[in-house]
């Protein structure tokens, strides 16, 4: 009796396994049928956003650019709101397949006390302006940068607009201008936007959104930016 029950139980287990195998087989067939569609989706190109208060947005963008280069793809890396004094420029401008553009100097600061005009801070040129009223020449720099990127879109698999979201949050460009550029990209082109304060409209439009969150940073203890680590 015990032997009979054991045999029946084993037979039941076998039937269950066969049913599971049949189901997996059917799912595999569906997967194979869809593989072509998935490949088309994979290769169509996507909009990425790296945002948030945490460190690492530009660093991650550089990593993505290097990965693209390693796969034999061409990269257009456009930096807004930055000068060419950052350490990574020494390497990026030497990489075959990557074109580096820099738009954005001198630095500027939104002043709460209505202080305006040019100044020097740590031997760097700085332009103060009233909060909510960014200098018109800086708007033109950003607009010229977006125009140059648009003119050079052809032939790149990855386009990086580094710190363009900061430019947007300062009122140096508009969401409409950025969307107009996104609409000019072709099938197979990925475009990455970086910077703090990503707008809700661009987040809704993007396919991949990554937010860097600062939990702790030594600059809050008075440690200044370190060459080779922070700049």
Tell where the protein language model's regions lie, with residue ranges.
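Short, charged beta->alpha transition segments
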Residues: 35-36, 145-155
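Conserved P-loop
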Residues: 46-150
